[in-house]
Amino acid sequence: MSAALKISTPVFPMSVRWKSEVLGSSDIFPTMNDAAEPSMVGGRFFDSLWSKALHPTLRTIVRLFRRITHCLSTMGAAEIPVLNEWLAYAIHQLLSIAHDCMASDLHECLRLSVLVYSMVEIKTFGGLPYMSSVVTALRSRLRTGLPQIQRIAPDLSFWMLFVGGMASKGRASRAWFVAHLAEVAEQLSLKEWDTALALLEGFLFIYQPACPQPEALWNEVKRQQALELDA
């Protein structure tokens, strides 16, 4: 996990035995087709025009995170005894393809966004000091890649920015994510939280009514839009 917090490739290769044990427990996950039903989490990664351009290995890893997210949304962590093993495997895979994604803004922004999502939404490492470097890396790559991604996949850019906004809570970078979320929300005509939530769930997102942070971020976005209208 230290490699994830430092955004570096894994120091040690994955044990063949451990990998076999993890993959052998895959029956806990439901079979999910790429052409998902609208109610299925993560469907936008596979049924959008821009998704055809994704690196095959990155698509496979996103598919794995999609299955993990679906299980967490429907069963909860307590009912998935091998969750930590599967998450460690998925993050190891995500870190291992850094070289393949680096040349493409779309691929690298997506890779970093999924990494941040796994650390904040699933494992709740958001308060750790090393998270600042992860959030900084995502924002730095979005600074160059966001214009293109926003043009070809505004829905994806909204999800990436929202993930970054969640991870940047209490950090100076929060304002940057909020400002760009306000812009993309306007582009997508997102007016209400329920509509924004439906879009987020089309990617990777676990909504917990008892957790106020996502809606609090959305309220910041709405206040930012109001400020821009008054300016």
Model-derived regions, located:
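Intrinsically disordered, low-complexity activation-like regions
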Residues: 1-231
